[in-house]
Amino acid sequence: MAGYTPMIQQYLKIKAEYQDAFLFFRLGDFYEMFFEDAKKASQELEITLTSRDGGSSERIPMCGVPYHSCSSYIEQLIKKGYKVAICEQVEDPKSAKGVVKREVVQLITPGTVMDGKGIHENENNFIASVSKFQHTYGLAFSDLTTGENLVTAIERLDDVVSEIYSVGAREIVVSRNLDEKDVAMLKERCGATISFEDEQADEVPGIVNGLGSKELVDTFMRLYVYLKRTQKRSLDHLQNVQAYELEEAMKIDLYSKRNLELTETIRSKNKKGSLLWLLDETKTAMGGRLLKQWIDRPLIRKGQIEERQEIVETLIAHLFEREDLRERLKEVYDLERLAGRVAYGNVNARDLIQLKESLKQVPAIKQLVGSLDHPKAKARAEKIDPCGDLLNLLEDALYENPPLSLKEGNLIKDGYHAKLDEYRDASKNGKDWIARLEQQEREYTGIRSLKVGFNKVFGYYIEVTKANIHLLEEGRYERKQTLTNAERYITPELKEKEALILEAENNICELEYELFSELRSKVKEYIPRLQQLAKMMSELDVLQCFATISENRHYVKPEFSDDVVQVIDGRHPVVEKVMDSQSYVPNSCEMGKGRQMLLITGPNMSGKSTYMRQMALISILAQIGCFVPAKKAVLPIFDQIFTRIGAADDLISGQSTFMVEMLEAKNAIVHATKNSLILFDEIGRGTSTYDGMALAQAIIEYVHEHIGAKTLFSTHYHELTSLEEKLDDLKNVHVRAEEYEGKVVFLHQIKEGAADKSYGIHVAQLAELPDGLISRAKTILKELESGAKEAAPSTAPNMVKEAAEEAAATVADQPAQLSFFETDKPIEKETKLSKKEQAVLAEFKAMDLLDMTPIQVMNELYRLQKKLK
C-alpha cells in the first residue's frame, strides 16, 4: 500500500472493510471504482473500463458513474444480488488539508433497498435473519421500507425455507457459525444473497420488549444489528416486532405454493396467471402488499374468518358506498413507505404533499365505513385516526407544487414564518425596483431596445445593442460582458440592488431548508399513528377488493363445518377468468364420512389437475375471508394443504421426476393431519409401471389408514379403482369423455365411478401424429389388452402386489424401462411409412414416456409433428 498515492491508500483502507461490496468512491461529480471492483463493474454495468496512475509502477483499473444518475446503476447491481457501499466526501474539499475525508454513509443490499425501480410498490422488500438454537431455528423478517418486523421459532429448516420463499426475502443474514449445509440450502433453495453478522448489540431497542423469549429477541437482534451497521441512520420507523407461530395459519409448503401458483406462475414466474393476479382489485400499494400476505397465510380461526366475511358481505350489499370507498382509496398514497422515508430523512416536499393529499381522504373514508349497516364495520371506523393535526400542519406549511430539490426555495408558504416573509419582501421589492429600472433606463438613454436581464454567472445586467452604444453616457456604465451584437453593462445602483436581492434569496433558500427540516422532524413524531392508519386503510382496501371480485365474478359466501366438503358447481377461479367468454364447465366435490378420499381417473388433458387445484384454491379463498367460485360451498377449516402436481417438476435442480414425486409425497405423509387437504396427481408415473402402481397403492392405503386427511388422488393406473371395494373411505370419480365419429371429446365433467378406458392414443391424434403411426399404436394396444386379459388376476390389488414382486425378482435380467413398441410384428403394408415418417417413428419409439411429464410429452409430440410438416 505504501507505493500508492494518499487517495488510493484511503480507498484501499475503506475497501478493506467492505470486501463483499462494490465501493462507490466519490470523486467530484462521479462515483469511481478501482482494481477488481472496476473490472467486474465494467462487465456487469457495460461501462468503459479505463485506468489511472495510482503511484505504483502499473496503472490502476478504473471505471465510474455520474453521481446524479447513479441510482440506475446501483439498481442493476442490486438486482444481480450484489451490495453497494456508498462512500461520500464528508468535508469541504476547499477547506481540506491533504486528502478529502471520506467515509461510507450507507451499504445498499438486496434486502435494504429503500426506493427506486428495485422496489415494487405492491410487494414488500423483506430481509430475513436465520439463527440456530438447540432445538429450533429462529427466523426474523424486517422491511425497511414499511417498518414491519416479524419473528418466529421453527423446528425444521424446510419450513424456514418455505417461510422465506413466501415473503420473497432477497437477502438472508446469518452467523458465520451456522452449519455450512444449512447456509448452502438457504442460498440454493431461496435464491437469496447471504450476509453474515456476528456483532453484539450495544443496546436493545424497545421494539422487542413484548417478545418474552430470549431466543426470539436474539434472532431479531442479529437482524437489527446488521441494519444499524449497514444503514448508518435512524431506524425510528421500525414497528414493534410481532411474534407469530406457523400453527396460527394454514400451512402451505414450498412445493404446494409453487404448484398452486398462489402469487406467481410456475413457468414465467410472473404475477399474471396467479391467484394474486386474479384477486388484486386493490386501490393502494399497501393494500396490494397486504393481499399477498393474506394469501400466503390463510386463517384457521373461524371467528377471524367470519369477521372478514361479514364485512365483505356488507360491502357487497352497499354498492354505492363501496364504489365511493374505492375512489377515495385510489387517492391514498403509500403511507407505510412515506413514513419510512420520513424516518430515513430522505423524504422531500413532494412526498409530504402526497401525505397531505392522502390525509384529506381519511375523514370521508371514516364516515363511509361508519355508515355501513354492520357493527363490525362501525367498530373499524371508530379506530380510524384521521391525523387531523398533521393535516393542518402540512396545509399551513407547504406550497401545493413544490420543487423536487430542497435547496432552491419555493417550499414553504407565505405566512408560515415571519422572518421568511421578511426576506421574501426584500427580494420582491428589489425585483420590483429592477423591473422599474428597465423603463427608467430606456427613458434616460432613449434606447427602446435596452433591456435588463439576469443569469447565474454574471448576475443582473443592462444589455444594449452595439448600434446604440454611442447613446450611453460615458462614465455611468461599466462593461461586464461582450456579445456578438451587444454589450452588457452594470451601474453602481444595479450592483447594490443585486447584492441585496441575492442576499435575500440566499437567506430565503437557507431558511426554507431549515424550516423544511424542522417540519420533517415534526412529521417524524406522527410515524406510529401513520403506520396504524396505514394498517386500517390497507385492511379496508383488501376487504373491498374481496367484495368487488366476489360480486363481479358471482362468488358465494362459504359456510364452515367440522368434516364435510360440499362444493356445488365449483370453478377454478383463474382458469375461469382466463377463459373469459368461453363456456367454463363447473364441477362439484363432496367429501365426508365414508368419502374422505376421491380416486380420480380419466384421460390426459381432461381436467383432473384443474379439478384438484380448484378444490385447493376454493379452500384458500374461503380461509382468507373471500367468497368462493361456486353455487354453494360448505368446507372444513384445513390446517395444511399438500400437493404433488407434475407441472412443477424442476429437473434443472438435478432431481428426476420420480425423486421430486417422492420428496413431495414424503412431505405430505410425514406432516399431514386428519384436518389437512392432500392433492396427489399421478403419483408413481416417474418410475416403471409396476413400481409406480405399487407405490401409488401403498400411499393411498397409508393415507387412508394412518392419516385420514381429505385427499384427491388422480391416477392413470386404472387397476387401482378396485380399491374402492377394500377401503371404506375411498370413492372413485372420473372425468367424463366420449367418442364421437372415432374422435374423443373431453367434457371436463366429474362423474361418480371409475373411468372405463384411457384415451392416450386419442391425445396423440390431437397432436396430429401420422395416420400410419396411430394405426400401428392401436394394433399394439389391442395386443397388449388381449395379453393382459389372459393373465388377469382376480383383483387389481393382488395384481399390483404380484407385479411388484415380479419386478423386484427380474430387475437384474431386464432393461430398466421396456418400450411399449417392442414387437416381432412388422408394420403392415397398408400403413407403409415414408423415410421421414419412419425416422419420426424411430424417435417416438425411443422416447421414455414413463419418465416424462405430460407437458414434456406434449412438447415432444409437437416437435415431431413439426418435423413431419
Swiss-Prot record:
Binding, ATP: 602-609
Species name: Bacillus licheniformis (strain ATCC 14580 / DSM 13 / JCM 2505 / CCUG 7422 / NBRC 12200 / NCIMB 9375 / NCTC 10341 / NRRL NRS-1264 / Gibson 46)
Gene label: mutS
GO biological process, one term: mismatch repair
The protein's name: DNA mismatch repair protein MutS
Gene Ontology cellular-component annotations: cytosol
Described function: This protein is involved in the repair of mismatches in DNA. It is possible that it carries out the mismatch recognition step. This protein has a weak ATPase activity.
Family: Belongs to the DNA mismatch repair MutS family.
PROSITE patterns tied to this protein: DNA_MISMATCH_REPAIR_2
Keywords, alphabetical: ATP-binding, DNA damage, DNA repair, DNA-binding, Nucleotide-binding
DNA-binding keyword on record: yes
Record InterPro entries: DNA_mismatch_repair_MutS, DNA_mismatch_repair_MutS-lik_N, DNA_mismatch_repair_MutS/MSH, DNA_mismatch_repair_MutS_C, DNA_mismatch_repair_MutS_clamp, DNA_mismatch_repair_MutS_core, DNA_mismatch_repair_MutS_N, DNA_mismatch_repair_MutS_sf
Record keyword Transport present: no
Gene Ontology molecular function: any one: damaged DNA binding
